[in-house]
């Protein structure tokens, strides 16, 4: 699958989904995606130690998704404006998910919860209405990012480089250390180079990608 361990790219979820989709292709009776989702969740639980659907659902369904519930999760694909690209920059370091979780506070100030909820609502509204200005205003994590950024050398500079090059927003992918940015397609390469250069200035080589959103999801390709 090409996802490094401890990268913040959802490697365990991608493995679980790939295995389930491949196995399902061998049976005579096709399985519904809802059934595949539950099987993949069990694989993710074995790999990561807990049952959760946040990485499984987008790996299986494709694109940006909203999930609600665990036992019978509700999955809704969220439309993304056609011109949006995602820039991903993975510095050559490993950040174990356990370490990234351990640094998080057990309590969150009410003011931050309110701000985070407002940002989420604005972000979703921006996606549904293709309002790039609203996405830019709302693509901000005020709860997790401030706590985890200390684990990623140069994060502040990388984020600032992305924004200076025209990104709508940038933050930590998963538990890190990969950093992502949402950008208009016209600015994607400039943003990618800026982020890579910022990591390099802090002594970290990196791999980087510019990707559109694959709305088709996991599937068997070729023979």
Question: PLM features: residue spans?
Answer:
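Short, well-structured alpha-helical segments that form the helix of a local strand-helix-strand
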Residues: 32-46, 133-140, 192-193
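Phosphate-handling active-site elements
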Residues: 23-39, 71-74, 188-194
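Glycine-rich, charge-dense phosphate/pyrophosphate-binding loop(s)
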Residues: 127-223
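Alpha/beta catalytic cores of group-transfer enzymes, especially the acyltransferase/condensing modules
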Residues: 33-83, 170-172, 180
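Short beta-strand-to-loop capping motifs
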Residues: 69, 91, 181-185
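Active-site rim beta-loop-alpha module in soluble metabolic enzymes
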Residues: 88-150
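DPxDG-like acidic metal-binding loop motif
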Residues: 11-33, 60-62
């Amino acid at each position: 699958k090409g996802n490094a361990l401890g990268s913040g790219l959802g490697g365990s979820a991608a493995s679980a989904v790939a295995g389930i989709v491949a196995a399902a292709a061998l049976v005579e009776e096709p399985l519904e995606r809802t059934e595949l989702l539950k099987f993949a969740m069990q694989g993710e639980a074995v790999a990561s130690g807990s049952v959760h659907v946040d990485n499984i659902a987008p790996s299986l369904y494709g694109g940006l998704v909203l999930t609600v519930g665990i036992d019978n999760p509700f999955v809704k694909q969220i439309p993304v404006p056609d011109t949006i690209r995602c820039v991903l920059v993975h510095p050559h370091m490993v950040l174990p998910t356990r370490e990234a979780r351990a640094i998080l506070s057990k309590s969150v100030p009410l003011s931050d919860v309110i701000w985070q909820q407002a940002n989420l609502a604005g972000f979703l509204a921006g996606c549904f209405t293709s309002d790039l200005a609203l996405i830019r205003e709302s693509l901000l994590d005020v709860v997790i990012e401030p706590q985890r950024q200390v684990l990623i050398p140069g994060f502040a500079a990388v984020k600032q480089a992305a924004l200076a090059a025209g990104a709508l927003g940038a933050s930590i992918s998963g538990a890190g250390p990969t950093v992502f940015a949402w950008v208009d397609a016209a600015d994607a390469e400039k943003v990618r180079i800026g982020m890579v250069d910022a990591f390099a200035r802090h002594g970290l080589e990196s791999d980087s990608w510019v990707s559109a959103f694959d709305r088709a999801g996991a599937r068997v390709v070729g023979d």
